[in-house]
Amino acid sequence: MHLEHLMSSTTAVSWSKIGLIAYGDAQSQDGNLCITFLETVNGSNWRFHPPKKYVIHPQLHEDQSSNGNPKSPLFFHDLRSMHWNNWGLLNGELLAVCDELGNMTVLAAGQGLNGNGAYDRLSVLFQDNIFKIHNQVLPLESVPKKDATPKVERKHTKKEYYSTILDFQWIGNQKPSVAQVAAQRDRTNNIFKNQMHQCPPYGVFHPASIKSACIAIRRNGYIDLWYQFSNTLDFKKISLQLSKDKESEWLQYAQIAHTDKEQCFLIGVFSNVAKSFAFYELLINWNVNTTNQAMFHDPKLTLRHILRVRPDALGPNGELLKLENFHVISKTALPGTRPEILISYNILGTERSLVRRFQMVLSNPDMVFLSSLGLAITALHNNHSVLRYSMKHVQDLTFDSKIMDIQSHSLDALVCFRLHNGRFQLYNRHTWAVESETADAKQIGGYTKDTIISIFGSGFNYPLLPPADAIEWCAISPSSGGIILKLKCKPQPTFYALEQSVLTDPSRDIVHATAFAFEFVRFNNMIHSGEDLAIAAKTHVFRLQRLSEERAVNFIASVIGAILSLYGIHFDGPKEILEKLLQSKAIQKIFLLQMELGSHLKNKNVYSMAYASMKLRSINLAMNGVARNVHAMIQHTAVVNSLPNGRAFQFAFSKQDLIYSLIPSVNWFVSFVTFLTQQLIMLVNNPMDNTHSLVLGILSCITTRHLMLKVILELKNMIGLITKFPETTYTVLNESSRFLRKALGDSPVNLEKFEVFLNEINNKFLSLLDDHGAQSMDREPSFMVKAEIPPALGHVREFLLSFAGSALLAQTNLAEVFFASTHNLRIFDHQHFHPSVANLLQPPEKGLVVDDAILPDACRGSSSFSPLDYDDISSEWVDMSALVRIKRCVRCGCVTRAGNPVAKNNTILETSIVTKRWTALYSRYCQCTGLLYELDTP
């Protein structure tokens, strides 16, 4: 197979770290770019969202809305590669699209002329048509589903263009990164700890004066550097030719990699003319003005040819070799690492492959050789210019099948070889050994592993793929969770999740859970969304559930516990540290993972505990944010009232409208406290009842106790503000304050007494647990996940029930509480999805990502997956089916209007003022951190 096909099959798809997937369409007559993403159907099953199709052509900068006929016909070409800016700590929101001619277009997800929006909308930032850059920012409209007269025609070509881009790289910023080395078991307490390094930026990275930058190399040997200064929207370009020799005018392939030198790229090319490899060093001087930060200067490029070598014709044992693949891998973030050069050969007459691994090293020529040339050795002995690069042969790797492509993965810590027989082999960059484990299914009990370097080292691997001839393109998902591929016979991609061959040995569950936790922490530190890893973990949970329900739940608890351990999160510290922990993105991601792993289990508490925790955290942030804004508006109003022509109404209205927007969340919290009290009534009357045990987990878990106390504290703070600063000029606006008081007054449970009850539990709980030596790292995952008290802590259960009976229930109207409605809680997984798709759509062994053909005919659209009668972020019952713009979360499936303008009929008064409510925080991301996308309402 020719390398041109190998490169196009690998780079024809790009999966962003935020979850968007871009791939080329080589057949359609009305578009060449597809954008899709994985979305949950029912909490456990997923599907690829119907792709939006776009036309990327060289004339995008022209007026797209013009209906006039252009002077010359417009054509679009096949796309050769696409690249999200996933490198390092970049945000993954920019997409570079390169067509076969060499035109390069940069698109931005979630950005438009009117500001930020949902990520499923694209805008063009700039386009390079080889000879000219067009810096016109414009929205990119998707191709209509029914358009009989496309304005742009597809133009196929069989030619190879000299301007084709062979390799492309995004350049990272100067933020330091965290490199995870391994999860190491601490034998004193049998807990895995995270071994990590805080690494400074390495390789090539741009300074703060540059907003974004990228680099590419073309077939004709030209290097292009695009960059955007932080004070402008326009992009600039610097071009540089490798050499003026004819051999660099027609390159067969090229690679760009970061080196161990600061601000230096290693460029490797293979000339189709000279039939040899050439290597260059490219140094980038960003030309930062250190004396005047406001003055920006263009970067400077310095290119140096360092080596030329020819490919091997014979193998180590005299085999005839044919050059087949070439890959240069960047150095890793860890100090002391170097770029690696991999040259792949087919062994002629066989199906086997040989990969020769090299490193570029500096060496001093032999002095005897120099003296034979008549050079003065004494003059050259201390001259550093004598140092020359050479390729040091390090290792030969042999494979029993032809290599389809080579991909560096896991932040370049792993190298993945996809073979023609459908299998994958992954090598660790630090050991260059196969990163896998030969699992013995007969080994029962006593299994242990002290070091986990990656999930593949614990026995997980990618499944066998379909025949290579049936695959159009294939790539590894960003967080290692599986393989995305496009079959030639199917219109949409397919996802193959990681799988584990050994399931019958329960002693391996801890190691397997820690392996998932290690990858979760690794990629969460690099701002990955991680839905692919969640699907792989959920697949493993279902396979365990077939063997034992208890093992499946224990596995989830082990995953959550391992994540907390690897993050170093302890809940026994001071209250201030606990508050910061609960506000962190890591805790938010942990709640989401538990929700995803806990859906469709027999133990409903796993999902409900995570959802309740996430909801309490969201309400706490909303209360805190509104209180701070209300306090600021009170100060604004005081200033405006002192002015002769001040507009006090707008500030007063905005303040009261913010308060009004909190009322649904207050109603939810009141219902939640009522629900917990109802469960306490049931348990006090029947202590052996396990169907109402969620309250035990809520009261035992320190995170939920603390969050409930924080919400009550914020409510008291809000009531204090509206009592101390009522509206005197526009008294009608006080209605929202009255509604808030009424929502609290309608609670059948006295919230002040409930607060006292929680504080007393906090005070007595620690002494009860400390008496039995239970550590938070052991007990918290059990409380957080299982919502149950272990048998060893049975005295804690007895205390909770007896104390609840005397301290709370004895002072409560039990009949009023017991018959109160709590229908608006929606804390169970099936309540978030339409009944037609709420159950599993196919057996888990067939995969959790389903085709559209599996879905019921009436539930093919995304708007039919979740009920459209409830806004899960604002906690408000509202018929959203009639609204023009609503959003859905790809992870938890909630539907919301967050981030959109508030309708006049949903404010305290009809007014032309458009307020910015607290829900505007969730214009792009859901409260669970999932991606929000706009629904096509029926």
Swiss-Prot record:
Compartments it resides in: Nucleus
Primary localization: nucleus
Keyword terms: Activator, Nucleus, Transcription, Transcription regulation
A biological-process GO annotation: cellular response to heat
GO cellular component, one term: mediator complex
A single MF term (Gene Ontology): RNA polymerase II-specific DNA-binding transcription factor binding
Top-level taxonomic group: Eukaryota
Assembly and binders: Component of the Mediator complex.
Family according to the record: Belongs to the Mediator complex subunit 16 family.
UniProt function note: Component of the Mediator complex, a coactivator involved in the regulated transcription of nearly all RNA polymerase II-dependent genes. Mediator functions as a bridge to convey information from gene-specific regulatory proteins to the basal RNA polymerase II transcription machinery. Mediator is recruited to promoters by direct interactions with regulatory proteins and serves as a scaffold for the assembly of a functional preinitiation complex with RNA polymerase II and the general transcription factors.
Protein name: Mediator of RNA polymerase II transcription subunit 16
